[in-house]
Regions:
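Predominantly soluble domains enriched in secretory-pathway, periplasmic, or organellar proteins
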Residues: 5, 24-272
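Sec-dependent N-terminal signal peptides
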Residues: 9-17
Length: 272
């Protein structure tokens, strides 16, 4: 089954993110029988991020036909905890790819059995994965001024994209969308930019300044990108402003519309 069809059939709900770093040990235990066995087209994966540094992230599965939910399916299928801060999950190539931020790992699982089929390790603090092909994907990071290039087939890191204007301490790249050969990414923590990456050269070729801390990035069916800023927080060394919503044309990489909000009305209430 193609990745596009798989994306239509199985959807994912992700919890909000933690932005600190740390480490944890892989923990194994006896699993329990899993009642729900998903059929393609009848399910919803839910990543539960857990508490930072508690290593209690979990994966749930909701069957949309029976309206039954099974919790901790990764743990029960693999006799292993998912890790510390489940940041996001993406379907591609018939597999579910779970990005576990504070465990520095991405798990690939069979979406029917929930069994692990591979993992990408030695990541700094991964946030999201975007697939360019069966053998190439980008992984965004926080506390790193690079986007990692990985080979999903071999579960290996193959290279890096240097992001301008960042250090390892201030590095922050988040969600990615693609238009033609270009991938766009929002830079969130202590940042105010979107980056444009040429996927043929793996280089940043342009950037666009928006408001303080753009938290997310999506593309609509009209090839318009949308990003919303949280405006930072009071007392932040990077500044504090009211949140805004931006519409950006993907072809020209220019802001077409800016909708300003009030303090306290942005993502997370506009403050941290």
């Amino acid at each position: 089954m193609s990745s596009r069809r798989m994306n239509r059939f199985i959807f994912i709900v992700a919890g909000c993110c933690s932005v600190l770093t740390g480490c944890m040990k892989w923990d194994y235990d006896l699993g329990r029988e899993i009642a729900v066995r998903p059929e393609v087209g009848h399910g919803l994966f839910i990543t539960n991020e857990g508490n930072f540094q508690y290593g209690n992230a979990t994966l749930s599965f909701y069957d949309t036909q029976t309206r039954k939910i099974d919790n901790e399916v990764f743990f029960r299928a693999n006799d292993q905890k998912l890790g510390d801060v489940a940041q996001s999950m993406t379907m591609y190539g018939g597999l579910g790819w779970i990005v576990v931020n504070n465990s520095h790992v991405i798990f690939a699982i069979d979406p029917v059995t929930f069994k692990e089929v591979g993992r990408i390790t030695n990541l700094t603090s991964p946030r999201y994965i975007h697939f360019l092909s069966d053998e190439k994907a980008y992984v965004t990071q926080i506390w790193d001024n690079r986007i990692f290039i990985v080979n999903p087939k071999r579960f290996e890191i193959t290279g890096y994209i240097d992001c301008p204007g960042m250090t390892m301490e201030t590095g922050s790249t988040e969600q990615m969308v693609q238009y033609g050969k270009y991938v766009y990414v929002n830079c969130w923590s202590y940042q105010n930019r979107l980056l444009k990456i040429d996927t043929e050269t793996d280089k940043v070729v342009d950037e666009l300044v928006v408001g303080i801390q753009p938290t997310s990035l999506v593309m609509d069916k009209y090839d318009k990108m949308w990003t919303i800023t949280d405006g930072g927080y009071e007392g932040s060394p990077y500044g504090h402003e009211a949140p805004s919503l931006y519409r950006i044309d993907a072809a020209t990489f220019r802001i077409e519309k800016q909708l300003n909000s009030n303090f306290g009305n942005g993502p997370g209430g506009g403050r941290h």
